[in-house]
Amino acid sequence: MAYSYTEKKRIRKNFGKLPQVMDAPYLLSIQVDSYRTFLQDGKSPKNREDIGLQAAFRSVFPIESYSGNAALEFVEYSLGKPEFDVRECILRGSTYAAPMRVKIRLIIKDRETKSIKDVREQEVYMGEIPLMTENGTFVINGTERVIVSQLHRSPGVFFDHDKGKTHSSGKVLYSARIIPYRGSWLDFEFDAKDLVYVRIDRRRKLLATVVLRALGYNNEQILNLFYEKVPVYLDMGSYQIDLVPERLRGEMAQFDITDNEGKVIVEQGKRINARHVRQMEAAGLTKLSVPDEYLYERITAEDITLRDGEVIAANTLLSHEVMVKLAEGGVKQFNILFTNDIDRGSFVADTLRADLTRDREEALVEIYKVMRPGEPPTKEAAENLFNNLFFSSERYDLSPVGRMKFNRRLGRPYEVGTDQKSREVEGILSHEDIIDVLRTLVEIRNGKGEVDDIDHLGNRRVRSVGEMTENQFRVGLVRVERAVKERLSQAETDNLSPQDLINAKPVAAAIKEFFGSSQLSQFMDQNNPLSEITHKRRVSALGPGGLTRERAGFEVRDVHQTHYGRVCPIETPEGPNIGLINSLSVYAKANDFGFLETPYRKVVDGRVTDDVEYLSAIEEVGTVIAQADSAVDKDGNLTEEFVSVRHQGEFVRMPPEKVTHMDVSAQQVVSVAASLIPFLEHDDANRALMGSNMQRQAVPTLRADKPLVGTGMEANVARDSGVCVIANRGGVIEYVDASRIVIRVNEDEMVAGEAGVDIYNLIKYTRSNQNTCINQNVIVNLGDKVARGDILADGPSTDMGELALGQNMRVAFMTWNGYNYEDSILLSERVLQEDRLTSIHIQELSCVARDTKLGAEEITADIPNVGEAALSKLDESGIVYIGAEVTAGDILVGKVTPKGETQLTPEEKLLRAIFGEKAADVKDSSLRVPSGTKGTVIDVQVFTRDGLEKDDRALAIEKAQLDSYRKDLKEEYKIFEEAARERVIRLLKGQESNGGGSTKRGDKLSEDLLSGLELVDLLEIQPADEAIAERLTQIQVFLKEKSAEIDEKFAEKKRKLATGDELTTGVLKVVKVYLAVKRRIQPGDKMAGRHGNKGVVSNILPVEDMPHDANGVPVDIVLNPLGVPSRMNVGQILETHLGMAAKGLGDKIEKMLKEQRTVLELREFLDKIYNKVGGEQEDLDSLTDEEILALAGNLRAGVPLATPVFDGAEESQIKDLLELADISRTGQTVLFDGRTGEQFDRPVTVGYMYMLKLNHLVDDKMHARSTGSYSLVTQQPLGGKAQFGGQRFGEMEVWALEAYGAAYTLQEMLTVKSDDVEGRTRIYKNIVDGNHYMDPGMPESFNVLTKEIRSLGINIELKNGD
């Protein structure tokens, strides 16, 4: 196998036994693909499919005027270039978006002839569309945001029942619901009396037959649609019916049934069974004589006209009187409906009988009354309303997904229509659709068919970014359409153009609202690369059109069998959102309809193939799926007699020939975060959930450290998260420094006529959304060869292209003087000294100068009543220097605000007018460092309103940026020149000259001659070979173009910097100061492992006091052994043992290197590690001796191991590895107390565990207050750190003081420390004077209470006891 640049340097030993059939897919594809499909930006307008933006325009246009004389048609849209790039947008606080222009055609027709009179085409600006960055995020108002995908109920038809909860009798009531993509919902439901009702949009219910009548059906037709008929013959005073024996099965015989000879087949009172049916068929019975009583309560199927003209209506219940009328009326034959009590209920007929509407008009009026209560119905209004509800493509759309689900559920064939027309027809309901739904509902009530499971993933679909943006865009366009329709009638008379007609504001507003404030547009979680990826792969059931936390029951939140391989059963938040917010599984993807699919290998006749097929939950029904670890021989045949499989949502065992599919990978079930937990299979599910959630909260440490025990997914996550710099093309590293990498591209990957140079600029010390530090570090060296896709620089929390969220710590499971009580963690001071768990946090502090009523605020160093010392860190403009170390209370930006004018005497006014003295009427409103913060200023940005003069600092910053940019461009051009020179020398070497430059005609061009010349001279040489001359010309042209392009880039940058910034109204200047704060680990910080084993640091001990082993090696962390058994997360113990083996092997390699062993010995030892302990085999022979030495050097800190989820290392393998590292197979070590040197009673489990520092730091939570702000009404201190509030001394705390009898303490708590306004002012004054006397007064809350009682109309007064 070929190793990549980083893999060669550090191979991770993999314990996986199962073959890799397919690699994990690109993890952000659900976001990136969805938005790319929505925009279709790369496609030419003619080739755009009818989806996304194109579909939104097509569905609203053409817009016709009310008269039909003018229309607007959509031609095409185009997206421009965004004004600023992503980094500039983040800096400026603007949105990364592209301007959209739409070509619109205005057609004006002649009023009389309707022929086209005039056509005008024009491009119209339609606002800006936010663009997605390459990592699947959006920059909105300068912050990175993610649009979370939504899991909602798929459009279509669903059949359900109430589980007997609605009616007191416990009777199960069935219902059907047609859910469109947009439009009104249509529900059919049974009530306790077995009548069928209909609801439109969940309003008051109507009898279902009202809708059927409104569709234009009469009684007979309705009965015909739902029932079969049974002919009844009247012959010689007795009745006969046509006999279909099968229909009688299950009924009670109400009379003896005899054959033609009179032999009794079924006696009266017996139940007719299958044997009786067969006997009747054998006897050839076709008619059956029935007594009159048998026909009572039966229902007539159609209108029956008697001899005297009287009509017995269809749907009449037969009774003795009716039968007599029929006999007297000379009716020889009539039809009744075939109904029974077993599987042919007379529900629709009963409903029809209860329905009071007589014809279509009355039915329409009934529906109108329900939909528009209180409005007087007219025939036209009722007709229009009903048609618009379900039969108008403007108001109702089932969508292709809905139609597919609808037809599938009703057992019809389904092909998706491609053209606009067929889509519209399929999008609305037909009469047959409504009747089929009602028919299916009745059949389910009759006991045929099943109700649907609404939590099945075949009935829930994913709406991703693209689709949601499209819907929002359509909403905006529909608003535009209304406005345009009004004005189209004037288009002809006023000679308007499309630009005059269309106002794009509603579209821009709809898009802005969606990206800025939708529930699903979220502030990106940017703690570390994993949290970014997880956020983008999140699937939420909440949001517009989804569920709400309060209404969501237990079933929706629960794990469903269809989640397997689609949605992770582990990763979901704890708390009120549990089960409503999920994470996609590693291999899952959404198909074109939005249903989640997961890949399986096909199995044919018991043989597993390498064909991979993606199945959605709908297609999975009926398949038989084997586990990924089923035993297979070398030809791929399943070897077990009975294979463990999943079938119809159950785990069963089946013979191999019945198996249809097999899992692709053991990790298929879980999400990305869960797949990073080694030995997940040994952890309790609740702890695994905490583990996967806490990995997302890990703060990037100063020096990332790869996990010794990983799962093999680390590299995928680091690469796909986009925090690393990845080579676009292969080549050689030409130049490298801390902020730039330059690659000379390989010849075969170059495009004709380019210099073949790729330049990568790195991100240095920028702030993330969570205030952590984003920084990229180079991992390549000058002259290294890299291939496309290799990692060039690590980002935050990545180490050599692998995700590295924490640090490998030497842990011991033992108690230590109560310092690990209740999951507390005891740390060694060594961790602090080595800065293992130190993180950098960057805070952004802003100072805004506004235009106030009294005059403009000013940013200046001239601040009243502030000493020199306080201004020492500010420059002349009043802004802090970069590099200044500041502490709480220091001034960062000096700012003065005009004070209210005081009454001045005429003399003062005169002096003011003459000398312009203004110092007295401004107050200091500078930006200061908040309490509890200290750090270093690493950057300052100044934004000035357009049209205002920039101050010195702003100009200096601008100049520095321009200089740096010019330097970049110069270097870029220099690199291009160098590359071009080398290519020219390569081309000319060995050629013959035709003169030109310093050469003569016929000169042989040697390398020595050429290398002494400058590029300008080289390009003047004219070679004899014309092809080479042509290529030299190409290079010359290319260099000219590059030079012009670079000049243009510089001019553009200069223009951008020179123009003022768009600031919100009333803001003149904004100064942003970035503070870097270094946070070491300290008691009170929260730490965790990857198995849900979290704890708070309780103490940091000197190294010499920590327990140590016989060699004197101290442990880093002491954990409580009692945290393991009850929590059942044994994975952490296995990780500890395996980590110990990994470190032991590293130590052995280091020893070999120190002893300068031969490369051959190193190879042998590495071969033992990688290829003799089981797991995946590594091809070490493909590495050169230098590469082996480099590999060994990188393994000294420990050999990284991968134990994939559900396919990890076995106990025996861990023991073998421990043995190979010369460590006891038990994994336990004798430890000694560092303080006394005494041995502990028994051996202790010691090993290496990967520990994370979580973003719950004590520095952010620690808070103290003496005085501060008070609440307006109660005059009590505010609460919370953000408000600089106090600690609430509540009811129970008061009880405690009462119980102790601490009267004076209690008094000061309830008065001067809380809401006794005068008392607290007095005591403050007293304390300042050094007099600690307290004089409590009346608490303000007493006054509030008296006022409240008065507001109830009870007069209450306080009488002082004077």
From Swiss-Prot:
Q: Which UniProt keyword terms apply here?
A: DNA-directed RNA polymerase, Nucleotidyltransferase, Transcription, Transferase
Q: Biological process (GO) annotations?
A: DNA-templated transcription
Q: Name the PROSITE patterns for this protein.
A: RNA_POL_BETA (PS01166)
Q: Which molecular function GO terms apply here?
A: DNA binding; DNA-directed RNA polymerase activity; ribonucleoside binding
Query: So what family is this one in?
Result: Belongs to the RNA polymerase beta chain family.
Q: Which InterPro entries match?
A: DNA-dir_RNA_pol_bsu_ext_1_sf, DNA-dir_RNA_pol_bsu_external_1, DNA-dir_RNA_pol_su2, DNA-dir_RNAP_su2_dom, DNA-dir_RNAP_su2_hyb_sf, RNA_pol_bsu_bac, RNA_pol_bsu_CS, RNA_pol_bsu_protrusion
**Subunit info?**
The RNAP catalytic core consists of 2 alpha, 1 beta, 1 beta' and 1 omega subunit. When a sigma factor is associated with the core the holoenzyme is formed, which can initiate transcription.
Q: Which CDD domains match?
A: RNA_pol_B_RPB2
Task: From the Swiss-Prot or TrEMBL record, give the protein name.
Answer: DNA-directed RNA polymerase subunit beta
Q: Which reaction does it catalyse?
A: RNA(n) + a ribonucleoside 5'-triphosphate = RNA(n+1) + diphosphate
**What is the annotated role of this protein in its UniProt record?**
DNA-dependent RNA polymerase catalyzes the transcription of DNA into RNA using the four ribonucleoside triphosphates as substrates.
HAMAP family referenced in this protein's UniProt entry, alphabetically:
RNApol_bact_RpoB (MF_01321)
What species is given as this protein's source? Answer: Acinetobacter baumannii (strain AYE)
Give the UniProt entry's GO cellular component terms: DNA-directed RNA polymerase complex
Q: What is its EC number?
A: 2.7.7.6
